[in-house]
């Protein structure tokens, strides 16, 4: 079964190690930005991640959507494998 709860800091660590960069902080949330390579047809992605607690449920699903994930379970597996 796929794990669906992760510490916010672990999510930030995985995303920043895969091209996202920290662009701001508001309260307990950090803002990350991914700029696509020139040959990529995707738009810039902005992601907000709460870092003070475990992230799961709809919040984790929203983060996956903001990252452009098509498959939520695959996104969770990717986070688990890279944390």
Give the location of each predicted region:
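Short alpha-helical interface elements
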Residues: 3, 36-40, 74, 80
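Major-groove DNA-recognition helix of helix-turn-helix-type DNA-binding domains
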Residues: 23-42
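Flexible domain-boundary/linker segments
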Residues: 18, 32, 80-81
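N-terminal first-folded block
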Residues: 1-26
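C-terminal structural segments of small proteins and small subunits
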Residues: 54-83
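Short, mixed charged/polar active-site loops
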Residues: 44-46
């Amino acid at each position: 079964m796929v794990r669906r709860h992760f510490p916010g800091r672990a999510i930030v660590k995985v995303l920043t190690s895969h091209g996202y960069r920290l662009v701001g902080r508001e309260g307990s949330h950090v803002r990350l930005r991914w700029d696509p390579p020139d040959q990529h047809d995707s738009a810039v992605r902005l992601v907000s991640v709460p870092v003070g607690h475990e992230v799961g449920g709809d919040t984790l699903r929203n983060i996956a959507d903001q990252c452009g994930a098509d498959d939520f379970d695959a996104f969770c597996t990717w986070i688990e494998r890279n944390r």
